[in-house]
Structures are given as C-alpha cells and as structure tokens.
Amino acid sequence: MVNPTAVIRTNRKSLSLTISKKGELIVRAPRKLSMEYIYSFIKQKEKWILNKQKVIQNTNLDNNELFNSNQYLFCGERYTKIEIDKLKDIEISGSNIFVPANIDEDRRNLLLIKWYSNITKEIIMARLSYFADLMQVNYSSVKIDNSKSKWGSCSINAELKFNLRLSMLPHKVIDYIVIHELSHLLEFNHSKEFYRIIESVMPDYKKHRARLKEYNFALQLLR
C-alpha cells in the first residue's frame, strides 16, 4: 500500500493525487472526506502512482549520480559499468559497458563523448536512410553535436543536427526525433500539418514524444 506524504484538506469538492518532483504522493481532499475513502482511492490508483514515481526516480538522476553510480544509459536501458585494465576505448557487451580503468574523470568524459557520438551516428544514419526513403525527402548534411538544450534540429538549408546523447534513448523515441526533423523538410514549422505528417509515419508519436520528456535529464549528462 502506498502511503501519502501529505494529505491537504481544502474546500474543494473532489479528491486529487499529485506526485511531487521528489516522488512524494500529495493528496488534496475535501475537508470532510474520510481517511478510509482516501486510502481506498489510493489503492485503486496504486499502479499509476508507482509508475509515476518510477519515472521521477529516473529523471531525478543527475550527471554525477548516474555516471558515478556504475551505470550508463544506452537505448533506454541502464548498463553496468565495468572497469578493465589496459582497455583503451569503451566497449559494450551484453548488459555491460566496459571502460578503461585508472583514468581521470576528464579523460573518461572525453571517451564517453566520443563513444556516444560514434554510436549515435551509426544509429541515426541507419534510421535516416530508412525514414527519408519512406517519406521521400532529401537532406543536405548530418552532424552529431553536443547541445545541452536540443535533441535535434533542421535548418532551412536541410542541414540536420542530432544530439550525441540520442543513443541513450529508447529506439522508438530516437525514431520519433528522426521523423520530427525530417518532417521539417516538408513543413518548416510546428503547424497542424507538420504534426499530421509525423502522424502519417508514426501514428502513436504522441506516446513517444511524451516519453522523450522523461529523458530530458539526459541532456545534462556528460560535460
């Protein structure tokens, strides 16, 4: 049973549940509503509450906590960091990411940026090839950048940029970003027509767009 962190009594007529940025369950209830009813309502919403708390737990991880906790993000999953002596570059196998041992933080950061950049480019080029052909669009160039605010962009000259951290995201979320930027080659705005184009390629794009927000914290990972 999930217990609320706080029950706030107000003059409202309905009962509401809110999950704070810290993952706390806050209940707002009418003044005369019984605690028995409140706990019954919480029980009915328990699955929703736990899912929300899990999402917040993930998004609250900052750079130091994630990259110093023996875990790295790759394709939406957490991989265990294993340090290996005499290893020169980063390697991935199974559910592990192997990194060189006995190197300082700055050197490891540079290796991670290089590794994520390379693997992101591989993923992006493959998905661009598929979706550009499907959508019958052409782009002039592709660049992998280190933006701390954008996952991708498309210029008026059909130049595409994608964030090196894209390979941290789930595959379907990556696809959404690729489709989003390619759609700008047909509609250079965020109009209804623009989103109609996206929907024609990815009918459930709203689900993946919403999930992307859960990974906004990843934009701040790596320096």
Model-derived features: positions:
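Active-site-proximal or metal-binding-adjacent scaffold patches in catalytic folds
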Residues: 1-175, 185-223
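Walker B beta-strand of ABC/ABC-like P-loop ATPase nucleotide-binding domains
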Residues: 178
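Walker B catalytic acidic pair
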Residues: 181
